[in-house]
């Protein structure tokens, strides 16, 4: 059995779980999430725990087993604690600002780049060179953070760009002075 899949998902106090066929709805203090799970996977409630099971030991079923359990755990964590992803802007004149619910990035282009967060997502700008994406859906938080990073990914020579908090940028040595050539 999958080591991750066989662990039960604990339902904390204040969280309501509704299972209808292969659709699971989780309601908590921060919001509500609904997800459709593969038909092969069975999700059952046993007291204050959710158990995920699979029909056979076939490789696709084993993969779906662990995945489904992890997605279910992320739903429960999202509606109780929420998720956040931090980004840092590195570079002279690179800065972020919030206008209404839009994020405006000045990252060396001839124009500022505007981004609108999706539903259920929130963007904070605690400092001009720092952006925090918050939400209850881990997948959506990560996707928006990746989209912001893709506006100006970090480059390996000077390390300028938008990077995740704590991300290590592998640096390269630049070209050395002119050597030889025609006279």
From Swiss-Prot:
The keyword rRNA-binding applies. GO terms for molecular function: rRNA binding; structural constituent of ribosome. Keywords: Ribonucleoprotein, Ribosomal protein, RNA-binding, rRNA-binding. InterPro entries: Ribosomal_uL6-like, Ribosomal_uL6-like_a/b-dom_sf, Ribosomal_uL6_a/b-dom, Ribosomal_uL6_bac-type, Ribosomal_uL6_CS. Belongs to the universal ribosomal protein uL6 family. This protein binds to the 23S rRNA, and is important in its secondary structure. It is located near the subunit interface in the base of the L7/L12 stalk, and near the tRNA binding site of the peptidyltransferase center. This is Large ribosomal subunit protein uL6. It comes from Moorella thermoacetica (strain ATCC 39073 / JCM 9320).
């Amino acid at each position: 059995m999958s080591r991750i899949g066989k662990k039960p998902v604990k339902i904390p106090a204040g969280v309501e779980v509704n299972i209808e066929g292969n659709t699971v709805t989780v309601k908590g203090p921060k919001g509500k999430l609904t997800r459709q799970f593969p038909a092969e996977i069975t999700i059952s409630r046993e007291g204050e725990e959710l158990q995920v099971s699979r029909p056979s030991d076939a490789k696709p079923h084993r993969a779906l087993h662990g995945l489904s359990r992890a997605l279910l755990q992320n739903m429960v964590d999202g509606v109780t604690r929420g998720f956040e992803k931090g980004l840092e802007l590195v570079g002279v004149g690179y800065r972020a600002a919030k206008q209404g619910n839009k994020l405006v990035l000045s990252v060396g282009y001839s124009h500022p780049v505007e981004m609108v967060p999706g539903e259920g997502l929130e963007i904070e700008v605690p400092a001009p060179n720092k952006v925090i994406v918050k939400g209850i859906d881990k997948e959506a938080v990560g996707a928006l953070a990746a989209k912001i990073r893709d506006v100006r990914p970090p480059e390996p020579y000077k390390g300028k760009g938008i990077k995740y908090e704590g991300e290590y940028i592998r640096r390269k040595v630049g070209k050395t002075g002119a050597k030889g050539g025609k006279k």
